[in-house]
Amino acid sequence: MAVKVLVVDDSGFFRRRVTEILSSDPNIVVVGTATNGKEAIEQALALKPDVITMDYEMPMMDGITAVRHIMQRIPTPVLMFSSLTHEGARVTLDALDAGAVDFLPKNFEDISRNPQKVKQLLCEKINSISRSNRRSSGIGSASAASPAPAAPAPSTLSSRAPAPSAAAPARAVPSRTVAPAAAPAAHAHHTPAHPTTTGTAKRKAYKLVAIGTSTGGPVALQRVLTQLPANFPAPLVLIQHMPAAFTKAFAERLDKLCKISVKEAEDGDVLRPGLALLAPGGKQMMVDSRGTVKILPGDERLNYKPCVDITFGSAAKSYGDKVLSVVLTGMGADGREGARLLKQVGSTVWAQDEASCVIYGMPMAIVKAELADAIYSLDDIGRHLVEACL
């Protein structure tokens, strides 16, 4: 069945171009367009699209306000278009706070110069988002800044029942330590193929926690990091697929919400306990055995800048078995090869479970490759990090 898309933008040119690009994919049908947030709400209610593309700056009602109304009245995955500026980054993070799933830079130059690349990226996003699991969670909300409850109530964006306790049937165990060989079969059916044990991975003197993520990552990272205490004993490195103009604003926002310190990484930064360094967009981040960070130019041959595999690989080389790595929600398979290197030197690899992912791509790649030592629900990862490291 084709993915139904509603295109919302006050620019006639942009509406037409997005419609043309999406209509070229046989799996996508544009069911309607809107010129402002008010029309977007009306069209969403009438057409019930699978995905909505949304501009921010529009007359009558802006995109963020429209997203909030849509999430309250007819929850639908929203892909935001945003400008590549610091203000655009702030607005985009606000949109994710309101409930949007993901974003793309609104770059008219790219549409003209690289139409095939734009088509591939946009259509891939739409198709993936249409299959996504939605969770209500806000960046910057007061509730999100507090540790998540052990068994959260279902939200307006999720029909999932509350996670059962460890005593409940195994089919819905939200957090489990998995024998690597059993992981793929267990996760695919939500029922372990072999007996598994609930609880936290074996405690080890970790020298580094490395977390990689993509689509859905800004919200997921906030969920995890806000549960860590100020005295968290290990340094952290964060790799989030994000444009260069966005990572500084995102790091600043996380720093305000978290008890630990968070900053955009700079070349020569020193790793220290209770500090999370976010890889800068458009570049690559590596760590060395002296406990310092190296920031390198983004390699055009690589799809991702920053790339989880690059950072994980350097961590494996520099810290051996003293790395605890976590792969969160995201499209694609970035992180799999880096996790493979980490496993080869004896480090620990965790993956987010399918039910709590916005896009079950990167964690699925870890699980299918039999690299996951444990699979945890998003709400449980922060707690398990504390238990494993403190």
Curated annotation (Swiss-Prot):
Domain Response regulatory, first and last residues per copy: 4-121
Modified residues (4-aspartylphosphate): 55
EC number: 3.1.1.61, 3.5.1.44
Subcellular location: Cytoplasm
Gene3D superfamilies (alphabetical): 3.40.50.2300, Methylesterase CheB, C-terminal domain
Entries under SMART domains matching the protein: REC
Domain CheB-type methylesterase: 195-387
Active-site feature positions: 214, 241, 334
Main location: cytoplasm
Gene Ontology CC annotation, any one: cytoplasm
SUPFAM superfamilies the UniProt entry points to: CheY-like, Methylesterase CheB, C-terminal domain
Keywords: Chemotaxis, Cytoplasm, Hydrolase, Phosphoprotein
Single biological process term from Gene Ontology: chemotaxis
Substrates-to-products reaction catalysed: [protein]-L-glutamate 5-O-methyl ester + H2O = L-glutamyl-[protein] + methanol + H(+); L-glutaminyl-[protein] + H2O = L-glutamyl-[protein] + NH4(+)
Function: Involved in chemotaxis. Part of a chemotaxis signal transduction system that modulates chemotaxis in response to various stimuli. Catalyzes the demethylation of specific methylglutamate residues introduced into the chemoreceptors (methyl-accepting chemotaxis proteins or MCP) by CheR. Also mediates the irreversible deamidation of specific glutamine residues to glutamic acid.
Family note: Belongs to the CheB family.
Protein name: Protein-glutamate methylesterase/protein-glutamine glutaminase 1
Taxonomic source organism: Pseudomonas syringae pv. tomato (strain ATCC BAA-871 / DC3000)
Upper lineage: Bacteria, Pseudomonadati, Pseudomonadota, Gammaproteobacteria, Pseudomonadales
